[in-house]
Amino acid sequence: MNAETTDGKRVSIIGAKRSGIAAALLLQQRGATVYVSDREPVGDAERAFLEHHGIAFEEEGHTDRILEADFSVVSPGIPPHASVIRRLEHEAIPLFSEIEAASWFCPAFIIGITGTDGKTTTSSMVEAICLSGANSREQRVFSAGNIGVPFSSLVGEMRKGDIAVVELSSYQLERCRSFRPDVAVITNIMPDHLDRYGGSMKRYAEAKYRIYAQQRKQDTLVYNADDETLRAHFEGGGAFVPQLVPFSLDRKRASLGGACYAAIEGDWLITVVNGREEKVITGSGLFKRSFRGRHNLENALAAVAATRAAGVDVFPIREALRRFAGVEHRQEYVRTMHGVDWINDSKATNLNALRQALDATPGKLVLIAGGRDKGDDLSDLEERVRQKVSVLVVFGESKAKFTEAFSSVVRVVPALSLEEAVEQAQRYASTGETVLFSPGCSSFDMFESFEERGMRFKKHVEGMQS
């Protein structure tokens, strides 16, 4: 399927959330007859949008009308084993993701970014760098994908010569068949979402690897050489079509990838392009109170490698990194009260992100953790909790699991709500410590999203009397 072959086609869109209705409008504008179907009630805003644009839809179930289609676009939140997917597959109806469908109409240079952790921060840095390095007033930079605006909502505005920075989850990549970023980035691969992949890390990683499946020799693939899974995959002797550009905190390790890489040399973040070294920025120039830690060095390396591959010069990269202050809900500084710093890391929805937050936070801390359990093994955190955490405040569905795992190494205080957790943390935190809200779990037990969870945390912290 491509931009030339959608005109006159019948398309069923499965899922009436943001990406689904964005794909529906795009395909309708490109000549397709579109039908949207959702098993849940359609929201008021989505209903008004669909009715305004004359897009037919159904709700609270999928009728056989979805089978009257030449192909279907499936929203990322619908798992591969869902009954509606089985029905479509039984009728041999081709299934695509919203990202795939949008890419058919994209004339811009695409930088695609995926990984378990660091996607949003890296995407935000890449966007900032590209804006800093835009080579003319006519060149525009668009940011789309996993967390922000759907790709389908923006491709109609893009022109040749623009840059599209697209953040991609494994869910979005699963049904990509021809999507081909000019530069692809994989930040890391750690256990996450394994319930969707039958507990298989291999299947999860394979979904991530679809980001480069259609790349050509002139394209670039940036990967984290410090990640064991990625290092084994890309440095295990296999043949890969795009140019590989590794990044690493260890220059020697990065240099094994060839003539192009990004690494740390002393206090400097450097790139090497065709054997020529370029000093970009020092760690002291990069780090701020709201942006610190080993993982953010890795994110910066990924962003630098990607934007150099896209042709951005070193000077605008340096200037953009100096100004970059981090991303909301990712180790975000909220306030200091009575000598205690309060940090919002609501985006830590898995244990690796929690581990990174513990490593990045200086000194002793009171940790607020909990939420919906993803089946992760908490024992990996025991030594870090012993060394770093003075009091652990737990809430949400997983509080019993956290209590069982850590009550022998640290004082554990249960809370019935996030607000109570904040109040307990204030009670136990001492001057000079940090209160770190880094749940290590998904938000769906009590909140619609990690963003809502983070906003609730910040609102309560900002409202406390000093």
Swiss-Prot record:
Keywords: ATP-binding, Cell cycle, Cell division, Cell shape, Cell wall biogenesis/degradation, Cytoplasm, Ligase, Nucleotide-binding, Peptidoglycan synthesis. ATP binds at residues 115-121. GO terms for cellular component: cytoplasm. The keyword Ligase applies. One of its GO terms (biological process) is regulation of cell shape. It comes from the Bacteria. Its EC number is 6.3.2.9. It is found in: Cytoplasm. The gene is murD. InterPro entries: Mur-like_cat_sf (IPR036565), Mur_ligase_C (IPR004101), Mur_ligase_C_dom_sf (IPR036615), Mur_ligase_cen (IPR013221), MurD (IPR005762). Pathway: Cell wall biogenesis; peptidoglycan biosynthesis. Belongs to the MurCDEF family. It catalyses: UDP-N-acetyl-alpha-D-muramoyl-L-alanine + D-glutamate + ATP = UDP-N-acetyl-alpha-D-muramoyl-L-alanyl-D-glutamate + ADP + phosphate + H(+). GO terms for molecular function: ATP binding; UDP-N-acetylmuramoylalanine-D-glutamate ligase activity. Cell wall formation. Catalyzes the addition of glutamate to the nucleotide precursor UDP-N-acetylmuramoyl-L-alanine (UMA). HAMAP family: MurD. It comes from Chlorobium phaeobacteroides (strain BS1). Its main location: cytoplasm. This is UDP-N-acetylmuramoylalanine--D-glutamate ligase. It is an enzyme of class 6 (ligase). The keyword Cell wall biogenesis/degradation applies.
